[in-house]
Amino acid sequence: MAKYHLYDENYDHKGNFKTIQEMRNYLCEWKYDNNDKTYMDDTFDFIKSIKWHWDIEE
């Protein structure tokens, strides 16, 4: 089973997620906590726009 890892702009590990939806939910909470009112159409485009990174472990 794949596992997704999310890192911020400093490559600090932000979390492990079993699904892309779990990672998206985390990012939605992050947006809310940071008062980010931008629209997130695509999870991976949003990660790139905030200069974060992700990796997949199979």
Residue spans for each PLM region:
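Short aromatic-glycine-(Arg/Gly/Cys) micro-motifs in beta-strand/loop hairpins
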Residues: M1-H13, E22, E29-W30
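Short, mixed-charge low-complexity intrinsically disordered segments
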Residues: W30-E58
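Generic alpha-helical propensity signal that fires on short helical segments
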Residues: E22-R24, N35
